[in-house]
Structure formats: structure tokens, C-alpha cells
Amino acid sequence: MDFTLNEEQKMLVDTIRTMGQREKFKELARHIDETGEFPYDLLKKYADLGLLGMTISAEHGGGGQPALNAILCIEELAKFSPMIAAPVFESNVGPVRVIDIFGTVEQKKTIVPGVCRGELSVSVCMTE
């Protein structure tokens, strides 16, 4: 099995790295840690780049891409901070992916497209 990234995947990782430097994600991560406030305008930037819902079926507003592409983005964003990567995780391999596969028709119509457009965010709540 060949684990070499193709040119498109290399460009994707490079784009994420460049965006993180340009948008000063390290400083942003520090701000998030200090204040506990997430900058939800970041969702729109992610949506504009097609990072939200990359793996979600095109039928529900996603990109229909392989999971590896999303994982590469999540990995690169997490180098800045797990919180910076969280929306991309949640919209590709986390709760939105679960809704895309197992959700009701209504959930797929109302939740998934909004997340892919950066208009909604989702999370998971757990307890012991």
C-alpha cells in the first residue's frame, strides 16, 4: 500500500499551513485558551475553503471527498491547537458525519447543510 500523498493532498496541507500562519492561529489559540471564547467567524472562513463537510455526501451539501483529505486538514490545524481543528473534525468525522450516515431525513436537510456552510456548529456532550 502506498501512503504517499498525491499533489492535491500536498497542496491541501500547504494551504492549511499557510492559512494558519496568515490568520495567526497560534495567537488565536492562545486567546481561546485564555478567554474560553471561540471565534465563530472562523467557521465562515473554513466553509469558504470547503473544509466543513468535506467528507459529507454532496447530496447533503458536503464535498464528498475521501476521509483522508479531512484528516490531513484536521492534523495540520491541530498543530496550531485542537480547538482550531475542532470544527473541521466535527463536520467531517464527528457528529455531522454520524448525522449524514444515520440521521433522519429532516436532520440531514436542516443540520448538515447549515454546518457545511458555516452557519451552524455542532458538538458532543458526554457524562460519566
List each model region and its residues.
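Intrinsic disorder at enzyme termini
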Residues: 1-8
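A non-catalytic, amphipathic alpha-helix used as a structural packing/dimerization or gating element
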Residues: 8-19
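Generic N-terminal amphipathic, Lys/Arg-enriched alpha-helix
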Residues: 1, 23-25
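Residue-level marker of structural boundaries
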Residues: 18-21, 117
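Glycine-rich flavin
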Residues: 25-128
